[in-house]
Amino acid sequence: MDLIEKLAAIEEIKALKARYWRGVDSKDLELLRSVFADEDCEIDMRNPTGPGTGGAVVHDPDAFSKNCLRALADYTTAHHGHNPEIDILSPTEATGNWPMEDRLWLIDGAKGVGFEYLHGWGNYHDRYRKTDKGWKISFTNLQRSRVDKR
């Protein structure tokens, strides 16, 4: 790949990750599911809201997308990724590290999943694969560095 092709791939991957967060925050199941590879996909969300909070490693993007939005249904959410480090390994493979910050607010009158408010920081460690449908997330892992919640 020449420099222009690599830069184009990086921009496509940035847009892909932006769609991931928009899918989560807008509770758009179809959009969220569309960012993941159909085959050989691993979503590692152990300790999603801090150490000791459960979570799982999932290999089914359909199940992950549904369960993610179900868990967040009682919350207004805002997720942001900043200053990604994206490495294009080949014309069809790339990795990315995304510092992130998110906030979750319990909707008035809702039950939630054990907290009213969460403000978190961390990093997403991703792998991407280029498919006939464009770049897709083939692996993602959220590593939390700090979580404040009440």
Language model feature labels by segment:
Residues M1-S26, E30-D38:
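Short, low-complexity N-terminal intrinsically disordered segments enriched in polar/charged residues
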Residues L29-D102:
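A solvent-exposed, acidic/Ser-Thr-rich amphipathic alpha-helical stretch
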Residues L3, L7, G55-V58, F115:
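Charge-dense, low-complexity intrinsically disordered segments
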Residues E11, N47, R146:
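Solvent-exposed, flexible loop/coil residues
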Residues I4, A73-R150:
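A beta-strand edge to alpha-helix "cap/lid" segment located at domain peripheries
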